Amino acid sequence: MEENNQNQCIPYNCLSNPEEVLLDGERISTGNSSIDISLSLVQFLVSNFVPGGGFLVGLIDFVWGIVGPSQWDAFLVQIEQLINERIAEFARNAAIANLEGLGNNFNIYVEAFKEWEEDPNNPETRTRVIDRFRILDGLLERDIPSFRISGFEVPLLSVYAQAANLHLAILRDSVIFGERWGLTTINVNENYNRLIRHIDEYADHCANTYNRGLNNLPKSTYQDWITYNRLRRDLTLTVLDIAAFFPNYDNRRYPIQPVGQLTREVYTDPLINFNPQLQSVAQLPTFNVMESSRIRNPHLFDILNNLTIFTDWFSVGRNFYWGGHRVISSLIGGGNITSPIYGREANQEPPRSFTFNGPVFRTLSNPTLRLLQQPWPAPPFNLRGVEGVEFSTPTNSFTYRGRGTVDSLTELPPEDNSVPPREGYSHRLCHATFVQRSGTPFLTTGVVFSWTDRSATLTNTIDPERINQIPLVKGFRVWGGTSVITGPGFTGGDILRRNTFGDFVSLQVNINSPITQRYRLRFRYASSRDARVIVLTGAASTGVGGQVSVNMPLQKTMEIGENLTSRTFRYTDFSNPFSFRANPDIIGISEQPLFGAGSISSGELYIDKIEIILADATFEAESDLERAQKAVNALFTSSNQIGLKTDVTDYHIDQVSNLVDCLSDEFCLDEKRELSEKVKHAKRLSDERNLLQDPNFRGINRQPDRGWRGSTDITIQGGDDVFKENYVTLPGTVDECYPTYLYQKIDESKLKAYTRYELRGYIEDSQDLEIYLIRYNAKHEIVNVPGTGSLWPLSAQSPIGKCGEPNRCAPHLEWNPDLDCSCRDGEKCAHHSHHFTLDIDVGCTDLNEDLGVWVIFKIKTQDGHARLGNLEFLEEKPLLGEALARVKRAEKKWRDKREKLQLETNIVYKEAKESVDALFVNSQYDRLQVDTNIAMIHAADKRVHRIREAYLPELSVIPGVNAAIFEELEGRIFTAYSLYDARNVIKNGDFNNGLLCWNVKGHVDVEEQNNHRSVLVIPEWEAEVSQEVRVCPGRGYILRVTAYKEGYGEGCVTIHEIEDNTDELKFSNCVEEEVYPNNTVTCNNYTGTQEEYEGTYTSRNQGYDEAYGNNPSVPADYASVYEEKSYTDGRRENPCESNRGYGDYTPLPAGYVTKDLEYFPETDKVWIEIGETEGTFIVDSVELLLMEE
């Protein structure tokens, strides 16, 4: 159809770019003055953060010298009109009056400061500047709370940020110049502590109030979104951008100029011609649509390179408009990123592609609303679209269809109005999204531009004269498991988060100095887990690979699930110096578990930025000195160094000593000597409170009753790159019955009643290391600490000094003395740290009992090992409340069990002693009874071993409460064995050594049965076992055999000489009575004979079965006197008993028979032969005993 001259074009108008607005019936002129002032202040903070008169004058020039009551009122109105809420008159008047008073006093303070700068040694100028500082400081402490009056925090927030910034500035002055003014060191430190506290307080208030203000707005319609976005943009510019620079006021962290960057994005109003007073929001998207699809998700910082615009048209009237577009951007150091098509890829005109060779700092747009008349009776069609935009760069302009009147500079004005906008602009265009909604009868399209602050540079260039702050969102690649999340409000942009250990991000840096120069870096981060951050340099362009340059710990700063606040963010110390590999270079950052933490990764790590500084010699020496001073002072409970802090470990002191030793003699020799004396004093205090003897491992087993005792395979080694002093190495063992061990007893005389004590130390690495503390019960921990092999970087060998000693001053992996893993009652470690602690409670002390505390380290596995040192046993704290009641209860239970044990021991000892005495003919224990056999000795030994607590079950070399009586009886048992061996002329008659000393014909076996009992098995009738034995002719002998016959036939044990004089014992599995030559024992009457045998020796040993059975006099529920919980079987047994003890002998199974005969040899040699006629013959033992004369 033909163009209708009645079609109307309504110009962009009203609230999108107001000249004036109506609030509560009162007309108020606005001009974004608060935004102008804030942008100028941010530009000043970015480029001129050096303290002194120049900085103060800048604050006057940009804020406090030009803003009067009307301007402060405009600050308030700026927010009031957005949230449609007026501050109460009393609060408004008080705030403006206080701001005016602060401005006046600040001007007086600046005058006094400048006078002092010109004449710093004049007492009058020093006194005046101190007075003016204290007055202004007091006013700020008083008045700042008036800018956060409950109910009006949001409209007051922009003036709160200005006052907070002023307060931090003058506090920094007092910390830097205070001592030169005449303030004491204590005053200066108190001001510094207030400065740090207020940095967090002010930043958190700004972020929290910003979020609360946005959350309180309605969120339904398009117009709601317009208000929401304007408030978000204005509070970002006037509050959050300023708060992002608050941490830079920490002059001890930033002794030189930091270079800050703001990477956040702000959005100008959508280019849609809409008048909410005249038109319906039904033709526009809802709040949720605008927020979810027109606002970008958190992402890496990108740079706009190209914008391709597709033109669409509406057939009625042939109206052309911006129908869709595509954005091509790039990451710093990365390739191009092409966005999806926004809107529609229309082709009513050829696409217009704009490649910008510089930042777009301004747009002049033409959003229109055309009321198109359609054929009757159709209503007019509302067509909203963008019919033209001009994009301006500092050197050129790019126009799409035509230039408009909607100027982006009205919403984002320049930061410097003294120069043309192409030089003084504040923001650059970074992206564009698209709005579209259609219906009857309307079509609404529009564009939303997003902008980044000019301070975010287009390269990550390292300025050697400044501390370079690089937000990690300026990387070019995030790895799986890493995500970009919305920043908490005070970081100046988005941040990175990682939930699991692994690669974090890769970024490219440009070096503005020789490639050989060395640098240091640190991180600003928050974390709900302890971890390590690895920095690799020289990675490939893909971010893969590289060489480890920095490896430093990140200490946990928050709990899992805790909200991010300024207080949860911390800084690492500057790393050791490193060098870049190329220019530009690729930095790879990854998060790894702490040494010994395994794969545990619960929690999250958030990183805001990395900070890089040139490591010149002076700065390096000053930084090292500051770090050493901080570490030394942190050792003591007070500035007079009277006492050590309880949590300062001996290992910690050694590492602080290394820091001091590595200080430069050239730059700080006097300070180094002073700090060295303090560290030596700390070491002496550590030695004094340590109750262990010989904690430095001068020797093991040097003295029988004191110091360390240990197995012979333990080695003592001198200091290395991990330990400064001696440490011990415990190897593994092939037999758990013979563990590697190290122990020491803490004497009762050193202990205080009702006190908790702590064992702690440092483990370089360990596997299956068992640690015990024993008093009333056993505190036990198995510690596995994977070692690093060295503290030096993976790319370098451990440096050594000129004499072969470890060079502890060479660059190495960062040491964090705060990392610890304490294993206490009711707690379990998430992982095993190199630092270990184990505590034990002491109740009443008794020097007569001398219970003391046993400290034991043990390894009982073949793969086990440990390297440990800096061991301490020290008083932790007195027991109170529940802990006191618990130890009293444990002590009572221990004493009750001790009494039960004593009663039991009296009974068991009496029975065991009677059994042992019955083996001998007299009390001199030098002759055995004639009829004493091996079973009787075993049975007596079994009864002796019923005496409990002879040795500690945790380590059987340590004597227990019944050690004396046990060793008394056990010594007599060994005497019995020796006398018995001397009397028995047959060698290896119990087959414990296999077939040693026996001659074998045919196939025979020695088998272990019933818990290591060795028996001879003759399975074939043609097999024979024999032994030649020397005897005394004319003397009498007893041949005694214990054996068992399976199946038919007979088993025979024969004794004979060369020609004659033969006798034998026969064994069969028979039913009928058989008579054996020279032996009256038969199969049918064997049981009766055994009963007679038992009756004969009632007062002595009662045979295998009875002797190895349970003793009903022993309480079945008796628990260990040492470890109440770990042992519940009624016995605290150690499975590793003596090889000659009862542990290797168990009761004979039913069916075994013991037979004997008397034999009188006529020559000096006899032969013992064992065989059978059929079936299987099993022999337990063969004895040939010399009769007593």
Swiss-Prot record:
Q: Signal sequence span per UniProt?
A: none
Alphabetical GO biological process terms? sporulation resulting in formation of a cellular spore; symbiont-mediated killing of host cell
Its recorded name reads Pesticidal crystal protein Cry1Ca
CDD domains, sorted: delta_endotoxin_C
Family indicated by similarity: Belongs to the delta endotoxin family.
Q: Which UniProt keywords apply?
A: Sporulation, Toxin, Virulence
Q: What does this chain do?
A: Promotes colloidosmotic lysis by binding to the midgut epithelial cells of many lepidopteran larvae including Spodoptera species.
What is one Pfam family matched by this protein? Endotoxin_C
Q: Please, what other remarks does the record include?
A: Toxic segment of the protein is located in the N-terminus.
Gene name for this UniProt entry: cry1Ca
Record InterPro entries: Cry1Ac-like_dom-VII, Cry_V, Galactose-bd-like_sf, Pest_crys, Pest_crys_Cry1Aa_dom-IV, Pest_crys_dom-III, Pest_crys_dom_I, Pest_crys_N_sf
Sample GO molecular function, one term: toxin activity
Which Gene3D superfamilies is this protein grouped with?
A: Galactose-binding domain-like (2.60.120.260), Pesticidal crystal protein, central domain (2.100.10.10), Pesticidal crystal protein, N-terminal domain (1.20.190.10)
- Recite the lineage of the species: Bacteria, Bacillati, Bacillota, Bacilli, Bacillales
